[in-house]
Swiss-Prot record:
This is 14-3-3 protein beta/alpha. It comes from Bos taurus. GO terms for molecular function: protein domain specific binding; protein kinase inhibitor activity. It comes from the Eukaryota. GO terms for cellular component: cytoplasm; melanosome; perinuclear region of cytoplasm. One of its GO terms (biological process) is protein targeting. There is a cross-link at K51 (Glycyl lysine isopeptide (Lys-Gly) (interchain with G-Cter in SUMO2)). The modification Phosphoserine is found at S60, S186, S232. It holds the Pfam family 14-3-3.
Amino acid sequence: MTMDKSELVQKAKLAEQAERYDDMAAAMKAVTEQGHELSNEERNLLSVAYKNVVGARRSSWRVISSIEQKTERNEKKQQMGKEYREKIEAELQDICNDVLQLLDKYLIPNATQPESKVFYLKMKGDYFRYLSEVASGDNKQTTVSNSQQAYQEAFEISKKEMQPTHPIRLGLALNFSVFYYEILNSPEKACSLAKTAFDEAIAELDTLNEESYKDSTLIMQLLRDNLTLWTSENQGDEGDAGEGEN
C-alpha cells in the first residue's frame, strides 16, 4: 500500500515524537521521492530526521576511534575496534550518500526560492563534510572539495538574497566556519567568517522578525561560543569543548 504525502508526513511526525529517527527519515525520503518541492515544514522534518540518524553514527564513530587509539598495545582488542569502526563508517557513508542523492536528484533542482536553495546547498556541504570526517586518501580530497564547493555556492546566494539575521544564512556561516576550522585546519579563515557573520547580524538586529528571533539569536550565540573557543585554542589553551554546529 503506497501512502500519500500527508500520511507520510504524519508518520514522520509520529516517528519524531517517538524518537525513531530511522523511521522518520524513511518517511521523509519517500515524500521527497514523490518529486514535489517540499514545504518549509517538510524540509525541516527531512533535515531533523537525517541529522539525528547521521548524528548517532558520527558520535559512535568518535567513541570507537578514541577507544581504538587507546588499545594500541593490545592487537586483538584493536582489531575488534577497527572492524566495529568500519561497520559504523559503512552505515554513515550509506546515510550520507542517501541524502546527497536526494539533494542532487530532487531537492536542489526543485528549489524555486533562494532560501530553499541555500538550505539544500548547506545540507550538501554538511553531508560531504560528514563523509570527509571518515574518509582518507583521494576520497578525502574529493569529499572535502565537494563540501567546500556546496558551502561556497550557498554562501554567495545567501549574501545576495538574505538578511544577515536570517537563521538559514547564520546557520550556513556557522557550519562553513566549522568546516574551515575542523576539516581545512584554517583557524584564521574560520574565525574571520564567524566574526563577520556575527557582526553583520548584530548590526541589523532590528531586521529580526518574531518567528526567527529565537533561532537567529541561538545561532549567533553558537558563533560567539566557537569564536571564544577557537581564539583561546590558538593562543595555546587547549580547549576540549566540541564546536557547536547547526
